[in-house]
């Protein structure tokens, strides 16, 4: 029995991991009033079979179009040879712990390259924590009298947060939505589906709302368009006008931690297009074009591994200690419940070994030493289980274009490599699809 953190969404629900031998047998919720109370989303509870299937358990090297097993020394030597003197870019995936994102940033920037964790193109300013995390805590929802949702479907993006919103609604909270009309299990006022409704709302006077607690929740689908920065600026403007608090609802468990660690670059996604070598740390949702040499480090044989020229097998979230910062900016520790299969290693350790192979050895030999270096750069990460107060810095950005907001999570049950490896999640996804098609046919 190991106390840990769930990574299926960015809420950071506290869980207990029960293992038998090497295998995870079940996940149970742990009580944390500030995050998930005593609840856990069904997906988080039943995704354990995905940790057993399609695992990467040894390094692979692609030769003549086919992947062949390799030893660690050979794989690391090949990786270092491929990276030396080349234009390198790094991608940080959604499930990467903060330490691994920080180590990758040091490795790639040491080779003159750039690193990016905002792989979905979200226009989140990396130097403004009040804009990429917000100022609200999850507990603030409990006391809110008004809640505005912008471009988000919390039922898919963070089901336990949605349950908390429902609890507030039952106590009299009025909820309004700008975005696609979805079933949230409670009533809300639908203001419109896109930017026009947001612009109209921005011009509102908000009389009585100013005197009572309110919260504005912004989803990732609102921030991934070309005008994502303008949408964020509008949301912050509405938050100011209502004397409310802002919560950026992330859909990736590792995103806030990676941004805190500095794994961003304003020109990174353009650099990825022109890079000769791409180091992919579990970013399976990114389509990488033919051309660049791809090194994939991750736990599952998912999309990223299929495109890779070298595969370095890493541990999953239950198989290594890791720091995850949740959507409200709360650093939490995920503890190791079991060991990675076969020859798979901890993610930070792979990057440390590769740094030595490249002749630019990191100044740490253990996870504890890495954390000391990380905390020296980002002091608030030492405050485990505390939500730092972020200084409010409004974003000044361009004009809103016209158009509707989309969905950040299109298939709830298959949103990451672990879920896609799960037979149960595949079955649930198929059932959900059949249900939605039946509803459309009935209409």
Where are the model-predicted features located?
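N-terminal export/assembly segments and adjacent metallocofactor-ligating motifs
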Residues: 1-205, 221, 354, 411-443
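Long, low-complexity segments enriched in small/aliphatic residues
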Residues: 371-443
